[in-house]
Amino acid sequence: MTEETHPDDDSYIVRVKAVVMTRDDSSGGWFPQEGGGISRVGVCKVMHPEGNGRSGFLIHGERQKDKLVVLECYVRKDLVYTKANPTFHHWKVDNRKFGLTFQSPADARAFDRGVRKAIEDLIEGSTTSSSTLHNEAELGDDDVFTTATDSSSNSSQKREPTTRTISSPTSCEHRKIYTLDPYPMDHYHPDQRLPRSYPQVTFPEDDEEIVRINPREKIWMTGYEDYRHAPVRGKYLDTTEDADSYVRFAKGEVPKHEYTYPYVDSSDFGFGEDPKGSVIKTQPPRAKSRRRKENGERSRCVYCRDMFNHEENRRGHCQDAPDAVRTCIRRVSCMWCADSMLYHCMSDPEGDYTDPCSCDTSDEKFCLRWMALIALSFLAPCMCCYLPLRACHRCGVMCRCCGGKHKAAA
């Protein structure tokens, strides 16, 4: 790969972090492209390579450590996209195979929706920016990362001058945008740091809400750390500042105790009694429980990486969370027999196979798969119990008495 294409950040539909993989047909496995490493991969809108004046979509991947372009693939209508597992997806275009290993299932779902959106726009022939770019309502607030920039890329870039030239995604005209800078660049020496106004945060003296702010928290995870034990990302924090910025806290007056102790008259103590023997049994009222803070706060789930509210967290809300009832149903109905048969007899070269009870008639092995399952049910009659038990489980999930629950990251 070369360092030729550098799309604008504003032209991306979706952009995530992943490891670019390549397919080796000789060994039948997937291997990291160009030695591996975390890359910024996204679906962006570019001018069509054929030069017919129409716009197209490009899957562009750039490795972070050396800015090397390791993936360039134009999206076409005949693109075959496969979701092998929650964190590994691959696709095929013109006998070329590409794969991505994501850091979390949420990133994988966001990239999948971005590719499907690009294919839909190609099929419909829509090239307007309003129907393709920044469709946050359809892609979701937690999954799409179109304007986020990590600190590693910020530190490697130099300060831009006050006049910049940008290009519109749907036009070839160049326009200049003039920004008013309160500190002119020629007023300072090159090695002098520009003054910066630090934000000031004042916490209210209410003890019910406790705000935790970590200014060094990054919106992107770095390295290969497990996404289930990754630090909670600050979704609503402004991460445009450099990593060395900090938050100044305005200290208010120290709140005083409001405990009122009962007054005991000296006449209550007898002359023959020891004053130390009288104990005040009235305790001050306990402070308000902080359960409200736990119920009202939002956290990120370790399973699906989505934000959730503790107050609304019930069973069946997280599809990626472990479900003991569903696991028990699969074991009782011996569904492992069907999985083993489909893996050895009806899987593709990558080892992927359709769900045993899928009713998708577009599958070319639909009839063959169901005939094999019926024949296998004569050897394992308990497989016939799977469909009614699965239907009961779905009813339980709808009633919020079965299913997995979100779990907050530590």
Curated annotation (Swiss-Prot):
SUPFAM superfamilies: PH domain-like
Keyword terms, alphabetized: Cell membrane, Cytoplasm, Cytoplasmic vesicle, Membrane, Phosphoprotein, Ubl conjugation
Start and end residues of each WH1 domain: 5-122
Domain KBD residue range list: 197-252
Annotated positions of the Phosphotyrosine modification: Y224, Y227
Tissue: Predominantly expressed in lung, liver and testis. In testis, it is specially found in mature spermatids projecting into the lumen of the seminiferous. Strongly expressed in glandular epithelia. Also expressed in embryonic tissues such as heart, lung, liver and brain.
Disordered, as annotated region: 127-171, 274-294
Gene disruption phenotype: SPRED2 knockout results in a dwarf phenotype characterized by reduced growth and body weight, shorter tibia length, and narrower growth plates as compared with wild-type mice. Mutant animals regularly develop kyphosis and scoliosis, and show craniofacial defects, splenomegaly, and cardiac hypertrophy with arrhythmias.
Keyword Protein biosynthesis: no
Polar residues: compositionally biased ranges: 146-156
Gene Ontology terms: biological process: negative regulation of epithelial to mesenchymal transition; negative regulation of ERK1 and ERK2 cascade; negative regulation of intracellular signal transduction; negative regulation of lens fiber cell differentiation; negative regulation of MAPK cascade; negative regulation of transforming growth factor beta receptor signaling pathway; positive regulation of DNA damage response, signal transduction by p53 class mediator
Gene3D superfamilies: Pleckstrin-homology domain (PH domain)/Phosphotyrosine-binding domain (PTB)
GO cellular component: cytoplasmic vesicle; plasma membrane; transport vesicle membrane
Main location: membrane
InterPro entries, per database record: KBD, PH-like_dom_sf, SPRE_EVH1, Sprouty, WH1/EVH1_dom
Topological category with respect to the lipid bilayer: Peripheral membrane protein
Localization of this protein: Cell membrane; Cytoplasmic vesicle, Secretory vesicle membrane; Cytoplasm
Residues annotated as domain SPR: 300-408
Post-translational modification: Phosphorylated on serine and threonine residues. Phosphorylated on tyrosine. Phosphorylation of Tyr-224 and Tyr-227 are required for ubiquitination. Ubiquitinated; leading to degradation by the proteasome.
GO MF annotation list: protein kinase binding; protein serine/threonine kinase inhibitor activity; stem cell factor receptor binding
Quaternary state and interactors: Homodimer and heterodimer. Able to interact with SPRED1 to form heterodimers. Interacts with RAS. May interact with ZDHHC13 (via ANK repeats) and ZDHHC17 (via ANK repeats). Interacts with TESK1. Interacts with NF1.
Function: Negatively regulates Ras signaling pathways and downstream activation of MAP kinases. Recruits and translocates NF1 to the cell membrane, thereby enabling NF1-dependent hydrolysis of active GTP-bound Ras to inactive GDP-bound Ras. Inhibits fibroblast growth factor (FGF)-induced retinal lens fiber differentiation, probably by inhibiting FGF-mediated phosphorylation of ERK1/2. Inhibits TGFB-induced epithelial-to-mesenchymal transition in lens epithelial cells.
PANTHER family: SPROUTY-RELATED, EVH1 DOMAIN-CONTAINING PROTEIN 2, SPROUTY-RELATED, EVH1 DOMAIN-CONTAINING PROTEIN FAMILY MEMBER
Protein name: Sprouty-related, EVH1 domain-containing protein 2
Source species: Mus musculus (Mouse)
Lineage: Eukaryota, Metazoa, Chordata, Craniata, Vertebrata
